[in-house]
């Protein structure tokens, strides 16, 4: 995983250009419902996906009553809402590979929205499997840099069964195999508390540097529009903004 120290830059994560809080909550609730419905148990101790969903909800301060309502909804046999997990893959301008993960109750609607977004911002939606070979599918756990030294966190990660850690000026980013994700997350949560973020995602094997402000803004606009869709859970790309472009964009109102 070397070369991904600017992880926040690469993925264009939560910040000023992210979706509104209400939309974040909608996505969290949907993930809780689908995890409870499709998992082997409604007990998070026996359902890793549900446990991960509940951890993500706590990280984002989703109110407990809304979590309980989501769990009750999943257990309600009269609830006919059925969500399908879909992964869309395509290219933005300049050959940037994009992966979009979605949960939808209407595949045609979601596909049309995603395709329209790609087209509007100069990209093209491809077939599933067209770009995923450019990424590593793995678990990601992030803690603030001041939680402990890189050496201490690395020791904990090795003990827990994780396979890599990248530390930059603000964040320790831990990577795990998917099958070990829940175990590593549980171990680190017991040692360091709830992380800033944790999820299973697509991390680029190599990144394309964007050093042009206009190209960067168009790419980030595509990511922003995709993330605003209620059906879209996460967006990943194999890009990285150059330091100069990143600072310019961060400095804009």
UniProtKB/Swiss-Prot annotation:
Q: Which InterPro entries match?
A: Integrase-like_N (IPR017856), TACO1_YebC-like_2nd/3rd_dom (IPR048300), TACO1_YebC_N (IPR049083), Transcrip_reg_TACO1-like (IPR002876), Transcrip_reg_TACO1-like_dom3 (IPR026564), YebC-like (IPR029072)
Chief subcellular location equals cytoplasm
Statement: the UniProt record of this protein carries the keyword Acyltransferase = no
Compartment(s) of residence: Cytoplasm
What protein name is recorded for this chain?
Probable transcriptional regulatory protein RPR_05505
Q: Name one GO cellular component term.
A: cytoplasm
Q: Which GO terms describe its biological process?
A: regulation of DNA-templated transcription
The source's domain of life comes to Bacteria
Which keywords has UniProt assigned to this entry? Cytoplasm, DNA-binding, Transcription, Transcription regulation
Q: Which organism is it from?
A: Rickettsia peacockii (strain Rustic)
Short name of any one Pfam family annotated for the protein: TACO1_YebC_N
The family assignment reads: Belongs to the TACO1 family.
The GO terms describing molecular function are: DNA binding
The upper taxonomy is:
Bacteria, Pseudomonadati, Pseudomonadota, Alphaproteobacteria, Rickettsiales
